Amino acid sequence: XEKXIVVGLAADSG
């Protein structure tokens, strides 16, 4: 997903 933007928030589910 959007690494660095929402690090850990959504666990990179994209």
Swiss-Prot record:
It catalyses: D-ribulose 5-phosphate + ATP = D-ribulose 1,5-bisphosphate + ADP + H(+). The keyword Ligase does not apply. Pathway: Carbohydrate biosynthesis; Calvin cycle. Keywords: ATP-binding, Calvin cycle, Kinase, Nucleotide-binding, Transferase. Signal peptide: none annotated. GO terms for biological process: reductive pentose-phosphate cycle. Its EC number is 2.7.1.19. One of its GO terms (molecular function) is ATP binding. Heterodimer of a 40 kDa and a 41 kDa subunit. Belongs to the phosphoribulokinase family. This is Phosphoribulokinase, 40 kDa subunit. It comes from Selenastrum minutum.
